[in-house]
Amino acid sequence: MSQQLQEIEKVLSSHKLSGDDYAHIKQILGREPNLVEIGIFSAMWSEHCSYKSSKVHLSGFPTKAPWVIQGPGENAGVIDIGGGYAAVFKMESHNHPSFIEPYQGAATGVGGIMRDVFTMGARPIANLNALRFGDVLKDNKTSAHQRYLVRGVVAGIGGYGNCMGVPTIGGETSFDECYNGNILVNAFTLGLAKSDEIFYGRADGIGNPVIYVGAKTGRDGLGGAVMSSDSFTEESKSLRPTVQVGDPFTEKLLLEACLELFKTDHVVGIQDMGAAGLTSSSFEMAGRSGSGMIMHLDRVPAREEGMTPYDFMLSESQERMLLCAKKGSEAEIIKIFEKWDLDAAVIGEVTATGNMELFWHGDKVAEVPVNPVSEEAPVLNRPMSRPAYLDKIASVTIDDFARVPNQEAFERLTKSMEVVDKSWIYTQYDSMVQTNTIKKGGMLDASVVRVKENGKALAMSADCNVRYCYIDPKGGAAAAVIESGRNVAMSGARPLAITDCLNFGNPENPEVMWQFGQSCLGIKEACSALTTPVIGGNVSLYNETNGVSVFPTPSIATVGVNDDQNKVLMSSFQGEGNTLYLVGESNSEFGGSLYMKEICGVVAGVLPEIDYEKELTLWDLVIEANKKGILECAKDASSGGVAIALAKMAAVSGLGCSARMLVNDERDIFAESMSRAIIEVKQENSASFESMAGVLQCQKLGTVGGDIVKINNVSMSMKELQDNYFNTFKRVIERDI
């Protein structure tokens, strides 16, 4: 083999490009590519940027509704919330960086998703997160490392969000051994904008200037997009230099400068520099517009000496934006950003060539056609194979295991890391900044912010039961959409749209691709049935270490609108003597349940039945009854069943309860049948509520009050329950410090 060929193979390998990719690149260019061009193709055709393995499965997602202003394909999705305002939101992953460097990985994940939102012209008003960690309970190195990761990720999220002045108002955190080698950090941001003042990532108008704004460019994050498109091995700690370093104070200045700029008429288009940095932002803007672009890389503000064109194109330095502006507005734009102590430089212009032409001190260092890179990346229809494990686990039931006394099961489940209060996490976040948050964490099934401008409230919830997704990828993904929507409805808001973050293992494994394909089918089915279109999202693949993939984890965040910000429904008990109802049909359904995991020690069984009509009827009941003012609180009965839902309601409120649930088996108080809620009403409203419940099963459970929680044959004092609920998490996570 010639030395030249060896060098080419070495370069291709380091850029995760195949021989076929190289041949395709030569065909596109009509010549051999240089290193800058190889870097561009590598980044833009990476799994992270191109979605080449997932795109074929994402087609067909429902994306339209009368209230959808912008669906997938932009920096974030946009829905009309009435009164001239729009909610702009998106969810993205920062999994690989957070495993390598938890603080910076999580922090820059938060920073990146906020830029996606404010680049659309919206001021961020709420953050959520969905976090998955491995086993934190054992006294071994793996669990100790997971506890370290929890502490680092939470500190990173809080450190960035708090400095930005954007409240982090909720989220979801769960633990499973499948995440020992790959934690998942999914960040969500929602912003508020006027519905007729949305900005898009376009580069229209031949001759219009292309302007770089924000922080200077360094070498941090080089190769980040490619790193996030590969699985981990024992050597992955060496990837620390590929993790970006964030500066929230600079991002705060960038936010305010952009919002000031948006009040002018200077902006044609604007794009965040996220994964693949200047490469992705420039190619995406030109690609959407069908235009070309010239950029002079020596004009890009540099933070380090000796940087090359390759470095400038692929750096993932944070807090940067690319603008396409109206010609003649350059000086005024630069003045705005300099006022905010930020860099701004005219680095190029829009052309009609359809090519990206890059110059370095007057010399052309790259010329690549835009469309084949941004819009025509390879699409892979990877082989799929149904995993053999599904047949083995489908027949497993709780009757295959020795019975555990219900009281013992109740005591163990109230200490489950999935159940217990996560205030150790959310008290590190500023949840009340901007003064729009309605109630602190743990008091609502959804997280809610008021919209002062129109008197409404926005409710949001991020959810995914990964055990459901493991035993039934299609049904589990549908269940994630359902539960996320149900939590929003339990707060009194009407669910309107979702964003997703699809976290899966290695797509080169046919079983993983089958899980992914089935999950997409489940999301399509649920969103269509519930009329909650997908308006944006993210795919994160290669969540695998040493051949072990994470469980399918399609995180779903639903956003809904409550027409009256004064009628937000709590999820904990509100008053002594109030009546409790269980709405919805209960069966002995334990597949993928918390009970099976914690008490039986397995993740197995058949998923509880899904009935979209019953689900929508439940949502309508809660939303309409809340409008009439006859509800005191509503809580989704899901993980851990009715018993654990009641325990949580009691722990948060400080009020006990006495409940009697009709069951076929005493363990059914822990069963997880879907489309159920626990409702609290005042006695004088009982008849009205029962009348409204209509066709739904409505069982009177009992009453609120007392200093114990009792349901059927289990009970616990409020003192013990609140100790379990509020202190367990801290005891576990701070064990090493």
Curated annotation (Swiss-Prot):
Cross-referenced InterPro entries: PRibForGlyAmidine_synth_PurL (IPR010074), PurL_linker (IPR041609), PurM-like_C_dom (IPR010918), PurM-like_C_sf (IPR036676), PurM-like_N (IPR016188), PurM-like_N_sf (IPR036921)
Binding site for Mg(2+) 1: E92, N538
Keyword Cytoplasm: yes
Binding-site residues for ATP, renumbered to this chain: Y51, K90, D500, G537
Keyword Coiled coil: no
GO cellular component: cytoplasm
Active site per database record: H48, H94 (proton acceptor)
BP term (GO), one: 'de novo' IMP biosynthetic process
Task of the protein: Part of the phosphoribosylformylglycinamidine synthase complex involved in the purines biosynthetic pathway. Catalyzes the ATP-dependent conversion of formylglycinamide ribonucleotide (FGAR) and glutamine to yield formylglycinamidine ribonucleotide (FGAM) and glutamate. The FGAM synthase complex is composed of three subunits. PurQ produces an ammonia molecule by converting glutamine to glutamate. PurL transfers the ammonia molecule to FGAR to form FGAM in an ATP-dependent manner.
Protein's name in the database: Phosphoribosylformylglycinamidine synthase subunit PurL
